[in-house]
A protein has these predicted regions:
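A structural motif
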Residues: 39, 97-100, 128, 152
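Beta/alpha (TIM)-barrel catalytic core signal, keyed to glycine-rich beta->alpha loops juxtaposed to Asp/Glu
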Residues: 107-279
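N-terminal binding-site loop/beta-alpha segment at the start of enzyme catalytic domains
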Residues: 1-68, 185, 279
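Short, acidic/polar
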Residues: 22-34, 80-95, 141, 163-164
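Acidic (Asp/Glu)-rich catalytic clusters
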Residues: 7, 55-65, 89-96, 121-123, ...
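Acidic-and-aromatic substrate-binding clefts and catalytic sites of carbohydrate-active enzymes
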Residues: 22-25, 43-53, 77-82, 108-113, ...
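Glycine/small-residue-rich loop that forms an oxyanion/phosphate-binding "nest" at active or ligand-binding sites
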Residues: 77-116, 120-121
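Alpha-helical scaffolding within the catalytic cores
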Residues: 1-4, 52-59, 88-90, 138-141, ...
């Protein structure tokens, strides 16, 4: 495994396993399969409703807690100092741990400044090894990092070959925040898995288009957390460290960037209205 060093000196695996949209009843099996493959970084969230199943899997694995890099996220219905603080304790209870390796604010809506204050307190108390944000565009990230006492260590945002987040990466790097990808496969949109550029480059190394897309992100200094419920694909997604894309390969894949979300925009008033409706 390869690692990145966060702005507080904590080492984070470059490759992890995500459980977004994995039903709670399947999560334990999937996480145990991922651990068997070799994953040690596991990414969940309050809004995934499978934290308890992740905790069950980690406990059943028999491996010591310190073997894992465990991430979860505070959902917007728990925004604000008091609610966030209580929800973080509840997440730890579900995950069967007394500390988290990384805790993120899931969305830049609601009283996320209150949430971040609660996170800073728990960080100072040693309950959180690193804290950060998710889905924060460059403007929102710059705002919170300017006012935060503990600077965000990670920003997990939509990042894939069709949305390479070049502007966000520029500012995150400038201020020492690690970019992490959600949706590294774009959920297969724009026919990613049969894309001719990715397919042709992958064939040179005996790799799939999916593996090529992940390798591109790794070589672009992006942490990735691909999700699959199939163990054979978990293994494929893990086998990324035995080949290196050439500068020419990287340039060809960089040309795929459309610079726009394939899902939704946090700047769209309709998106904001939806988030406000659940607060």
């Amino acid at each position: 495994m390869e690692y990145v060093t966060l702005n507080n000196g904590i080492r984070m695996p470059k490759l992890g396993y995500g459980v977004y949209q994995t039903p709670a009843e399947d999560t334990k099996r999937c996480v145990l399969d991922a651990i068997d493959v070799g994953y040690r970084s596991i990414d969940t969230a309050q809004a995934y409703y499978n934290e308890a199943s992740v905790g069950d899997a980690l406990a059943e694995s028999g491996l010591p807690r310190e073997e894992f890099f465990l991430t979860t996220k505070v959902w917007i219905t728990n925004a604000g100092y008091k609610k966030a603080r209580a929800s973080i304790e509840e997440s730890m209870r579900k995950l069967r741990t007394d500390y988290l390796d990384l805790l993120l604010i899931h969305q830049p809506f609601g009283d996320y400044y209150g949430t971040y204050r609660a996170m800073e307190e728990l960080y100072k108390a040693g309950r959180l090894r690193a804290i950060g944000v998710s889905n924060f565009g460059p403007d929102r990230y710059l705002d919170i990092q300017h006012f935060a006492e503990i600077k965000p260590a990670v920003n997990q945002i939509e990042t894939h070959v069709f949305q390479q987040q070049k502007t966000a990466k520029e500012y995150l790097k400038k201020y020492g925040c690690q970019i992490e990808s959600w949706g590294p496969f774009a959920e297969g949109r724009k026919d990613m898995f049969t894309n001719p550029v990715l397919t042709q480059i992958g064939e040179k190394y005996g790799k799939t288009a999916a593996q090529t897309a992940l390798r591109f992100l790794l070589q672009s200094d992006v942490v990735v957390i691909p999700k699959s419920t199939h163990k054979d694909r978990m293994q494929q997604n893990f086998d990324l460290f035995d080949f290196t894309l050439t500068p020419e390969d990287m340039e060809a894949i960089e040309a795929l960037d459309g610079g726009e979300s394939l899902f939704f925009s946090h700047y769209d008033p309709k998106t904001v209205e939806w988030f406000m409706s659940i607060l």
